[in-house]
Regions:
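Beta-strand-rich domains and repeat architectures in extracellular enzymes and scaffolds
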Residues: 25-61, 198-203
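Non-catalytic accessory segments flanking enzyme active sites
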Residues: 34-37, 145, 152-154, 171-178, ...
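Residue-level detector of Asp-centered blade-edge/turn motifs that repeat once per structural unit
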Residues: 40-41, 91-92, 137-138, 206-207, ...
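Hydrophobic beta-strand positions that form the internal "hydrophobic ladder"
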Residues: 42-45, 96-97, 142-143, 211-212, ...
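A flexible loop/linker signature enriched in serine peptidases of the S9 family
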Residues: 49-62, 78-84, 99-111, 119, ...
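Short loop/turn segments that connect beta-strands within beta-propeller blades
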Residues: 67-71, 114-118, 182-186, 234-238, ...
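Cap/lid segment of the alpha/beta-hydrolase catalytic domain
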Residues: 399-524, 531, 565-569
């Protein structure tokens, strides 16, 4: 049954104060909360606050703690001079674990600090750092995920200096292993029974029993993400029991207990497919009670998974373990996010509450009656909220109060139908201080990445391609949610398989036409932009119409065949593009779906932005497109950001992107 209780209030706003100008610095130098977690006793919430401005313009972070009921103001536990993240509570609620790169920049180690502050205690000095960790319920052990330490660092440096640093593909590839750290002795024991599998997640059974471990065959995303397996590990003996393969993009293993049986649920792509919506899949481990691990031993024969979300018109985004009850989950629901709890009797999720915009980072008390999470609405940036499940929640953090004096563009929710009748949604941000009746305006269409992603009714201000950044400069901004994205169930998402640039393109164009017909958009001043898959769509659009007067292609794909062969998500990219180059001489589906194939038809000026060290969408995609545009004499600007990956981290580069995109539109619109 649908429940429309609002967890986080959002009042409609049409006017704003105008005492402050939105600068690129105010966008980039923002503090953002991350990773809230409720203490075992249910009284406190710990979280990290990350901000730019560290050494080299890279982010730094600090650990904060606040009362769940908001009775006392949050306080900072660490000084924030390093990158301190990922807080997790000790079993007695007396201290907080976290990761810190204080000793070596970009090398995370495990640390601990008392809830009342004081000096933080370093717990590891693992060469190469740790990838993740999980404090166990015995209070004496921490499960740590880390690569092997390897040989002497000076020997490695010597080999590099002599040129003896060759890389043989697939040989000696580092994998993250499961290790158990004894907090008293500081001894580390590696669980050898997992072999050379790459461990990506671990969750302990709430009664202090075995660990659920999710692993890949290799640390490489391709084929790692397609070769996930679940295991159950006894932390005492180190014994490993195999539960077998799980689906594409498997994540978030959680335990729950019902009727004498332990269940182990996780999230993966629905129906065993490569492309589609995520689903919650559940298995029963046969045992008479919670006290032993023979459940996993019996499960070695065969494990069956039941799809608990089959037929739901929403998409799970987070699945959260509750110590004394069934799991909670967040679901993307169109432009909103809803909170659900699993009903143990029906094995279906019951909707508890809904909030406009985005909810994330869900954490729950032992009973599941209290929760904390991150929430962002149309005019409020992401902050930590806490309170009873179902709401109302109290805002604990307030990381960007200065933004309340900025005049924002009014953000409207849109709903319309595609040319084939498919219901669609999206957002429109009007120019700051302007109303619909003052149009038409120059319109920038910003396409989201993924494609399995969405725009929600949240605060749209980020360093890459920001809706409100453009709205404060006088542009209307259209944020479409075309088919292939999340928030509308599995079938909606699965339409992208082998068909990128098809239905999603006509969905976007239909929204643009609607805004022109309504008098909002000026048909002579249209632009399109996006990052990642959005960058692909921008490149695709200008190869199929001359209606756009400017385009921005950020970290976008120009050639799906090349992307399948060189991108780190190759197996998924091959499914999106529809084929690979090694399937024969062609013709290939991926050529039909690639913007590079239509470069001769492009007349629109293009700004190409790309990180030099991008492994998700390698730089070659941008170079390929740049050379094609140069060949055909198309006006364009090609910008490469040194040291950057798929998302830009350095402050100077983020500032450049914001200013350069605005300048590009000012020039052409």
């Amino acid at each position: 049954m649908r429940n429309d209780v609002r967890m986080v209030d959002q009042e409609p706003q049409t006017t704003f104060p105008s005492s402050a100008e939105l600068t690129a610095e105010s966008v980039v130098d923002a503090a953002a909360p991350m990773g809230p977690v409720i203490s075992p006793d249910g009284r406190l919430v710990a979280y990290a606050v990350v901000a730019n401005g560290g050494e080299g313009g890279r982010p730094r972070g600090a650990i904060w703690v606040g009362a769940v009921d908001g009775s006392t103001a949050p306080r900072r536990l660490t000084d924030g001079t390093a990158r301190e993240l990922a807080p997790k509570w000790a079993a007695d609620s007396g201290s907080v674990f976290f990761t810190s790169d204080r000793e070596e920049r970009d090398t995370a180690q495990l640390a601990r600090i008392g809830v009342n502050g004081g000096e933080a205690e370093a717990l590891t000095s693992w060469r190469g750092g740790i990838a993740d960790y999980c404090p166990l319920f015995d209070g004496r052990t921490v499960a740590v995920l880390a690569e092997d330490e390897g040989g002497d660092e000076r020997q490695d440096e010597g080999r590099d200096a002599e040129g003896d640093d060759v890389k043989v593909w697939g040989r000696h590839l580092p994998v993250t292993r499961l290790r158990l750290l004894d907090l008293d002795s500081r001894e580390v024991r590696t669980v050898e029974g997992l072999g050379d599998r790459h461990v990506v997640e671990v969750a302990q059974r709430p009664d202090g029993g075995p660990l659920a471990v999710l692993s890949w065959s290799t640390a490489e995303l391709d084929p790692g993400v397609a070769t996930a397996e679940l295991h159950v590990v006894d932390p005492g003996s180190g014994a490993v029991y195999e539960l077998g393969p799980v689906g594409m993009e498997a994540q978030s293993p959680v335990w729950w207990y019902d009727g004498g049986l332990w269940h182990l649920a996780h999230v993966a792509v629905s129906g065993g497919q490569v492309i589609g919506g995520l689903a919650v899949l559940d298995s029963v481990l046969p045992t008479a009670g919670p006290q032993t691990t023979e459940a996993a031993e019996a499960a070695e024969a065969a494990v069956e998974y039941r799809d608990l979300t089959a037929g739901m018109p929403v998409c799970p985004t987070e699945l959260v373990q509750v110590a004394d009850g069934p799991p909670l989950a967040l679901f993307a629901d169109g432009l909103d996010t809803a909170l659900y709890r699993l009903d143990p009797e029906s094995l279906r999720f019951d909707r508890l509450a809904c909030a406009p915009g985005t909810l994330s980072g869900l954490t729950a008390s032992r009973s599941g009656g209290t929760c904390a999470l991150l929430a962002s609405t149309a005019y409020e940036p992401e902050n930590v909220h806490a309170g009873p499940v179902g709401g109302p929640l109290v805002r604990l953090s307030d990381t960007r109060p200065e933004l309340r004096t900025v005049r924002w563009g009014v953000q409207e929710r849109l709903s319309y139908r595609a040319s084939d009748g498919l219901p669609l949604d999206g957002l429109l941000i009007l120019p700051a201080g302007r109303g619909r009746d003052e149009g038409p305006f120059p319109l920038v269409t910003m396409v989201h990445g993924g494609p399995y992603f969405r725009y929600s009714d949240e605060f749209n201000l980020n360093p890459m391609d920001s809706g409100q950044w453009l709205a404060t400069a006088g542009y209307a901004v259209f944020l479409p949610n075309p088919r292939g994205g999340s928030g509308h169930g599995h079938a909606f998402a699965a339409t992208a398989a082998g068909a990128v640039g098809g239905g999603e393109w006509t969905d976007i164009l239909g929204g643009v036409d609607l805004l022109i017909a309504q008098g909002v958009a000026d048909p002579e001043r249209l632009a399109i932009s996006g990052w990642s898959h959005g960058g692909f769509m921008a490149a695709w659009a200008i190869g199929h119409t001359d209606r756009f007067k400017a385009a921005v292609m950020g970290a976008g794909i120009s050639d799906w065949g090349m992307q399948a062969g060189t991108g780190e998500w190759g197996v998924i990219d091959a499914a999106l593009g529809g084929s690979t180059g090694w399937e024969g001489p062609g013709p290939h589906v991926h050529d039909r779906n690639s913007p590079i194939s239509y470069a001769s038809q492009i007349r629109t000026p293009v700004l190409i932005l790309h990180g030099e060290q991008d492994t998700n969408v390698p730089l070659g995609q941008a170079i390929h497109f740049h050379r094609a545009l140069r060949h055909f004499g198309v006006e364009h600007e090609f910008v490469v950001y040194p040291r950057e990956g798929h998302w830009l981290r350095e402050r100077g580069h983020q500032l450049d992107v914001l200013r350069r995109i605005r300048a590009w539109y000012e020039r052409w619109l």
